[in-house]
Amino acid sequence: MNTVRVTFLLVFVLAVSLGQADKDENRMVMQEKTEQGKSYLDFAENLLLQKLEELEAKLLEEDSEESRNSRQKRCIGEGVPCDENDPRCCSGLVCLKPTLHGIWYKSYYCYKK
């Protein structure tokens, strides 16, 4: 019975000592993997940031091109309300009070001369 206890105690001590070494080794391996994972995450984050900046620059460029090409009209077209004191009707149009169908609007409209 003593030999069984001694054998069990010896196996237990060996398992604990070897297990502890494995635990320390496992901890070091985990730290290395964590550091590698962090560097990979930093790389992926930088790559994503670059792509987003490129996309933002492209969108801003398209917006500026669109605003350059689209000019606001500086005159008012036919049948559009205008101000009697400050008429901005296009050439060939005059700001007049409406006749017949538009009398109830109490506003001036651009009409052909």
UniProtKB/Swiss-Prot annotation:
What start and end residues bound the annotated signal peptide?
Answer: 1-21
Keywords assigned: Disulfide bond, Ion channel impairing toxin, Knottin, Secreted, Signal, Toxin
Q: Which residues form the propeptide?
A: 22-74
**Places the protein is found:** Secreted
Q: Give the molecular function GO annotations.
A: sodium channel inhibitor activity; toxin activity
Which Cys-Cys disulphide bridges does the record give? C75-C90, C82-C95, C89-C110
Among InterPro entries, the record links this protein to:
Toxin_22 (IPR012627)
Q: In which tissues is it expressed?
A: Expressed by the venom gland.
Q: What is its main location?
A: secreted
Q: Does the keyword Nuclease apply?
A: no
Q: Among the entry's GO cellular component annotations, what is one? A: extracellular region
Which sequence ranges form a coiled-coil region, renumbered to this chain?
none
| Pfam families according to UniProt | Toxin_22
Source taxon at top rank: Eukaryota
Secreted recorded as keyword = yes
| Family label | Belongs to the neurotoxin 14 (magi-1) family. 01 (HNTX-16) subfamily.
What's this protein's function? Answer: Probable ion channel inhibitor.
What is recorded about the protein's domains?
A: The presence of a 'disulfide through disulfide knot' structurally defines this protein as a knottin.
Name of the molecule in the record:
U11-theraphotoxin-Hhn1a
Q: Source species, please?
A: Cyriopagopus hainanus (Chinese bird spider)
Tell me the organism's taxonomic lineage.
Answer: Eukaryota, Metazoa, Ecdysozoa, Arthropoda, Chelicerata
